[in-house]
Amino acid sequence: MATFDDVKAVVAEQLSIDADAVKMESKIIEDLGADSLDVVELIMALEEKFEVEIPDSDAEKLIKIEDVVNYIDNLKK
């Protein structure tokens, strides 16, 4: 769950929300209140944190926090 903890910290910081509000099942836009600009900035912050590249075509599919965690875990394999 280390990836989740790191993702949670980045999401909380980028969206200026309490980290406790970020759950695996949280939808980034609907549940956490992100807008399209927030999502772009969030993806950039995740790329920097995890030293990965997330193409726009993949970023569109990252709806829930769980999607982000699984995506990053797969990249790190």
From Swiss-Prot:
A molecular function GO annotation: acyl binding
Entry's Gene Ontology BP terms: lipid A biosynthetic process
Carrier domain location: 1-76
Superkingdom as given in the UniProt entry: Bacteria
Pathway(s): Lipid metabolism; fatty acid biosynthesis
Family matches, as PROSITE patterns: CARRIER, PHOSPHOPANTETHEINE
GO (cellular component) term, any one: cytosol
Keyword DNA damage applies: no
Processing and modification events after translation: 4'-phosphopantetheine is transferred from CoA to a specific serine of apo-ACP by AcpS. This modification is essential for activity because fatty acids are bound in thioester linkage to the sulfhydryl of the prosthetic group.
Signal sequence segment: none
O-(pantetheine 4'-phosphoryl)serine sites (modified residues): 36
Subcellular location field: Cytoplasm
The entry's keywords: Cytoplasm, Fatty acid biosynthesis, Fatty acid metabolism, Lipid biosynthesis, Lipid metabolism, Phosphopantetheine, Phosphoprotein
Lipid metabolism recorded as keyword: yes
InterPro entries cross-referenced by the UniProt entry: ACP, ACP-like_sf, PKS_PP-bd, PP-bd_ACP, Ppantetheine_attach_site
Transmembrane segments: none
PANTHER family named in the record: ACYL CARRIER PROTEIN (PTHR20863), CARRIER DOMAIN-CONTAINING PROTEIN (PTHR20863:SF76)
Family: Belongs to the acyl carrier protein (ACP) family.
Biological role: Carrier of the growing fatty acid chain in fatty acid biosynthesis.
Name of the protein in question: Acyl carrier protein
